[in-house]
């Protein structure tokens, strides 16, 4: 009860909204993983499992073809509490014309991409109002869509696989006015995310540029200021037994599950306490100017490198123009590796 006595109702709801975010995926994923085999083997309700698997097979391509987004889910009140916990804000610097399609590259990944999720997978910060006529899709690991219930949940928020098949479908076969949000640095970039760090994994990440050229989608840089400040990440000194086990665990999970696992901590249920919740620190996602991209069926390496360099320049410009306004010093530099 000490937790309740130290917080007002709004703070309690904000904390609970963030607390549920990751566990709900585990809970929803555990239901079919446990229930389907159990019903199939140990009960007379085996037909329920058969129907669930049949539906998954029948509906297999939906997540790669735009999914089933729900305005109701994207506007849930819980996301407003989630937003206000930090708080999170979406800032537009230039209009996005509904006559084109876009790849919005999101930096940095963060230990967890809170800003990217709230700004693009929900309507809490007003994406539809800020960018009228644009439909956002947040790209993530395809493995999530192999799990019944979880796939329905994430599709309802406009989440899609970060696969070439899904990206090209959205950018060439769904008309115009679509924007696919890609966290270019991926999970590997999460390992670089420490308070005060402004490092993005981008030099060798050129696949999104190639897809943009093959589809003619404009490239849009975006940077979430504050996203690296909400967790402290522990990287133990090289040569120590802690680092040995940390690296072994990270390498194993990366190989088996394609997940980059961070050793992190934040606050607890109350401000000032220790735990794994993010710190209450503002996150502002600034969406930059779209970079026009020609459509080239088979772009060569030189062309990809050219537009990759132009994108890096656009991201650098966006960062430099807004860093002071959102809490960084004039001398802070964006490090691109």
From Swiss-Prot:
CDD domains for this protein: LPLAT_MGAT-like
Cellular localization per UniProt: Endoplasmic reticulum membrane
A Gene Ontology cellular-component term: endoplasmic reticulum membrane
Domain of life, per lineage: Eukaryota
A Gene Ontology BP annotation from the UniProt entry: lipid metabolic process
E.C. designation(s): 2.3.1.-
Swiss-Prot/TrEMBL keywords: Acyltransferase, Endoplasmic reticulum, Lipid biosynthesis, Lipid metabolism, Membrane, Transferase, Transmembrane, Transmembrane helix
Family according to the record: Belongs to the diacylglycerol acyltransferase family.
Annotated protein name in UniProt: Diacylglycerol O-acyltransferase 2-like protein 6
Organism: Bos taurus
């Amino acid at each position: 009860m000490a937790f309740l006595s130290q917080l007002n109702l709004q703070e309690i709801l904000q904390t609970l909204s963030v607390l549920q975010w990751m566990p709900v995926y585990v809970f929803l994923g555990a239901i079919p993983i446990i229930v389907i085999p159990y019903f199939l083997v140990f009960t007379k309700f085996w037909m329920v499992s058969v129907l669930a698997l049949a539906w998954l097979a029948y509906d297999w391509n939906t997540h790669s073809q735009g999914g089933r987004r729900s305005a109701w889910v994207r506007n849930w009140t819980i996301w407003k509490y989630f937003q206000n916990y930090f708080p999170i804000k979406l800032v537009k610097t230039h209009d996005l014309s509904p006559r084109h399609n876009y790849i919005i590259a999101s930096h940095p990944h963060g230990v967890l991409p809170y800003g990217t999720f709230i700004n693009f997978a929900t309507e809490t910060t007003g994406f539809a109002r800020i960018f009228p006529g644009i439909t956002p899709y947040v790209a993530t690991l395809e493995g999530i869509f192999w799990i019944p219930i979880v796939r329905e949940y994430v599709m309802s928020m406009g989440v899609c696989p970060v696969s070439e098949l899904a990206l090209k479908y959205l950018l060439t076969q769904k008309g115009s006015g679509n924007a696919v949000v890609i966290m270019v640095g991926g999970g590997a970039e999460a390992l670089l995310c420490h308070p005060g760090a402004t490092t993005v994994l981008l030099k060798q990440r050129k696949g999104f540029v190639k897809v943009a050229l093959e589809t003619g989608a404009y490239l849009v840089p975006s940077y979430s200021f504050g996203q690296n400040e909400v967790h402290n990440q522990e990287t133990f000194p090289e040569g120590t037994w802690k680092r040995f086990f940390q690296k072994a665990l990270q390498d194993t999970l990366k190989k088996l599950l394609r997940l980059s696992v961070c050793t992190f901590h934040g606050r607890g249920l109350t401000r000032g306490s220790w735990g794994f919740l993010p710190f209450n620190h503002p996150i502002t996602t600034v969406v930059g100017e779209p970079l026009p991209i020609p459509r080239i069926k088979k772009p060569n390496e030189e062309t990809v490198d050219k537009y990759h360099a132009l994108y890096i320049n656009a991201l650098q410009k966006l960062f430099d123009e807004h860093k002071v306004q959102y809490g960084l010093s004039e001398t802070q530099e964006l490090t691109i590796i």
